[in-house]
């Protein structure tokens, strides 16, 4: 099945729903899967999938958007493709609105705040708008940079409206 137990010494804190793509856990996919998997919470505590991202959060607030099964980040923090848009709070608030789990919200709020601060410090332009890359946005099949830039890796010196709105 697609429910994976954490590997020993991975730093993951619980079993998780796997996208069955390459053995890695993805922030974007996991956040959106949780919005649907919440309906099966009597079968498995799917929302805890996101706890593995919080457990792998760096001291400065960075969370890698893709993490290997052994717990290693797939990208360095300053790589333009290293992290995804700030969609974890969206998934968490949807879960909270359905289940009213205030204890979970209290537990994860510091991690969400630290990640927000990291994004604000490292993925914004001088005017406060956000940037990312094709892979970083999670919508890597929607090239939007000019042809002279790499659609996967480059921010194209643009303001990424979808990231600003998230």
Residue ranges and their predicted role:
Residues 1-25, 44-48, 52:
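Low-complexity, Ser/Thr/Pro/Gly-enriched N-terminal "stalk/linker" regions
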Residues 14, 19, 65-87, 120-166:
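The feature captures the catalytic groove of carbohydrate-active enzymes
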Residues 20, 27-28, 32, 71-78, ...:
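The substrate-binding groove and active-site-proximal loops of carbohydrate-active enzymes
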Residues 26, 43, 78-81, 85, ...:
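Solvent-exposed, acidic/flexible segments
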Residues 31-44, 87-104, 165-166:
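Well-ordered alpha-helical scaffold segments within catalytic/enzyme domains
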Residues 42-55, 102-122:
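Extended, well-ordered alpha-helical scaffold segments
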């Amino acid at each position: 099945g697609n429910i994976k137990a954490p590997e020993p010494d991975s730093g993951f804190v619980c079993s998780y729903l796997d996208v069955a793509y390459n053995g890695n856990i993805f922030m974007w996919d996991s956040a959106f899967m949780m919005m649907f998997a919440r309906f099966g919470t009597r079968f498995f505590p799917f929302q805890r999938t996101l706890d593995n991202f919080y457990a792998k959060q760096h001291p400065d607030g960075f969370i890698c958007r893709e993490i290997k099964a052994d717990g290693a980040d797939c990208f360095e923090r300053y790589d333009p493709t290293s992290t995804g848009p700030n969609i974890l709070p969206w998934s968490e608030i949807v879960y909270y609105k359905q289940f009213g789990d205030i204890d979970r919200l209290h537990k994860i709020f510091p991690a969400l705040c630290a990640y927000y601060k990291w994004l604000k410090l490292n993925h914004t332009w001088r005017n406060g708008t956000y940037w990312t890359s094709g892979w970083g946005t999670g919508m890597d099949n929607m090239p939007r940079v000019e042809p002279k830039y790499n659609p996967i890796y480059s921010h194209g010196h643009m303001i990424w409206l979808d990231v600003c709105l998230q």
